[in-house]
């Protein structure tokens, strides 16, 4: 049986689709739902492309870095591989999700949030008698914009230095980079919890 993923045309321009990541672009061209009930169920579009080019990225039998560059199309997959492994390092053992209410993705350098700031009395859900007015909770936009700070790391390595390295070993370094980035994100989050985001919402200070 022929599958669509085997004939998909991979190009570098797939990374520059407006409002879409490379993985989302791949998924749109080769939806995972089409593989339900097949041996490929459970793989996403990127993982199917790894299978297409027979690139093994984990375990004792993992391939060398150079295998990504055996063709121009398989080379297109390398940045996504790096991105995924770095993200894995950011998320491993991270407590950031435990102190984050929600995640918002957007394009821009600053962000205006919304908030509800009820008093202690307004937080109480009191009994409402028949015909009486129901108490209201007000949601409003924050007065000040939250300015975002860009963080990043450029990975520089001569091809000769990494081409013969196994992908699972190369991934260790990438996960370390991700862990460092995750630590910085956590520090940023704790600072906002402590000092606020510029909207007069710093944490209360208690003296013991």
Give residue spans per PLM region:
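Assembly/oligomerization interface modules of large self-assembling protein complexes
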Residues: 65-151
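Alpha-helical scaffold segments that mediate packing/assembly in large oligomeric complexes
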Residues: 153-208
């Amino acid at each position: 049986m022929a599958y669509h993923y085997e004939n998909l045309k991979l190009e570098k321009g797939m990374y520059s689709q407006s409002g879409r990541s490379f993985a989302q672009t791949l998924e749109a061209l080769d939806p995972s739902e089409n593989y339900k009930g097949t041996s490929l169920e459970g793989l996403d579009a990127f993982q199917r492309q790894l299978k297409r080019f027979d690139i093994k990225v984990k375990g004792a039998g993992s391939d060398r870095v150079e295998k990504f560059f055996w063709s121009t199309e398989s080379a297109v997959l390398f940045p996504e591989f790096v991105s995924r492994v770095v993200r894995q390092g950011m998320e491993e053992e991270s407590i950031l999700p435990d102190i984050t209410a929600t995640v918002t993705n957007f394009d821009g350098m600053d962000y205006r949030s919304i908030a509800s700031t009820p008093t202690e009395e307004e937080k109480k859900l009191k009994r409402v008698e028949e015909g009486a007015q129901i108490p209201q909770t007000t949601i409003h936009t924050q007065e000040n914009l939250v300015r975002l700070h860009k963080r990043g790391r450029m990975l520089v390595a001569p091809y000769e230095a990494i081409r013969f390295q196994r992908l699972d070993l190369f991934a260790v370094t990438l996960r370390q980079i991700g862990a460092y980035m995750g630590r910085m994100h956590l520090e940023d989050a704790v600072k906002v919890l402590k000092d606020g985001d510029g909207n007069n919402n710093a944490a209360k200070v208690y003296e013991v």
